[in-house]
């Protein structure tokens, strides 16, 4: 074999060293990452700092400094803006490629949110469109990589629950 014994370990070791370097840089500087850098490290641009508090439950405390550098603080006294409704668009034929979105769509959870519509649009990747009081699209978000809990939590913040 050309790679030799243990050759497959080299890329994993390189990745670990890269992540360790990034973690050290963030902890040393206490700096915030740009959203692109956070995405490259595997963190969502919508990451809330309260999510970083959960890392200890999964023995992931070494990720805490990077998580804190990539997260957004929840506004404690800010009034939440509720939207009049939302449309979750997805292609029925592609739904199997997004099992987390599929689990949400096929569950009873969509019925918990006032004004939420599920629309099957041919060829569409999972998209969430938030509607203003006039029924116009106020925000449009790709939920391609969201899990079921993220979709439910986001909708809980943006729509009125029934």
Curated annotation (Swiss-Prot):
One matching Pfam family: Sep15_SelM
SUPFAM superfamilies noted in UniProt: Thioredoxin-like (SSF52833)
Keywords, ordered alphabetically: Endoplasmic reticulum, Selenocysteine, Signal
Statement: the UniProt record of this protein carries the keyword Endoplasmic reticulum: yes
GO biological process terms, semicolon-separated: 'de novo' post-translational protein folding; response to lipopolysaccharide
Domain of life, source organism: Eukaryota
Signal peptide: 1-28
Main location: endoplasmic reticulum
Places the protein is found: Endoplasmic reticulum lumen
Any single GO CC term annotated in Swiss-Prot or TrEMBL for this entry: endoplasmic reticulum lumen
Family membership: Belongs to the selenoprotein M/F family.
PANTHER family (UniProt xref): SELENOPROTEIN F
Function: May be involved in redox reactions associated with the formation of disulfide bonds. May contribute to the quality control of protein folding in the endoplasmic reticulum. May regulate protein folding by enhancing the catalytic activity of UGGT1/UGCGL1 and UGGT2/UGCGL2.
Quaternary structure, from the entry: Forms a tight complex with UGGT1/UGCGL1. Interacts with UGGT2/UGCGL2. Interacts with RDH11.
Descriptive protein name: Selenoprotein F
Gene: Selenof
């Amino acid at each position: 074999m050309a790679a030799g014994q243990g050759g497959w370990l080299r890329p994993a070791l390189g990745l670990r060293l890269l992540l360790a370097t990034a973690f050290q840089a963030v902890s040393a500087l206490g700096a915030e990452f740009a959203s692109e850098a956070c995405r490259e490290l595997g963190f969502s641009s919508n990451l809330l700092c309260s999510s970083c508090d959960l890392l200890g439950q999964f023995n992931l405390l070494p990720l805490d400094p990077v998580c804190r550098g990539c997260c957004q603080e929840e506004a404690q006294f800010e009034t939440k803006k509720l939207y009049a409704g939302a449309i979750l668009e997805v292609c029925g034929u592609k739904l199997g490629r997004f099992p987390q979105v599929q689990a949400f769509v096929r569950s009873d959870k969509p019925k918990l949110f006032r004004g939420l519509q599920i629309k099957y649009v041919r060829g569409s990747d999972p998209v969430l469109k938030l509607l203003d009081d006039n029924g116009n699209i106020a925000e449009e978000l790709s939920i391609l990589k969201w899990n079921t809990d993220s979709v439910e939590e986001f909708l809980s913040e943006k729509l009125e629950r029934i």
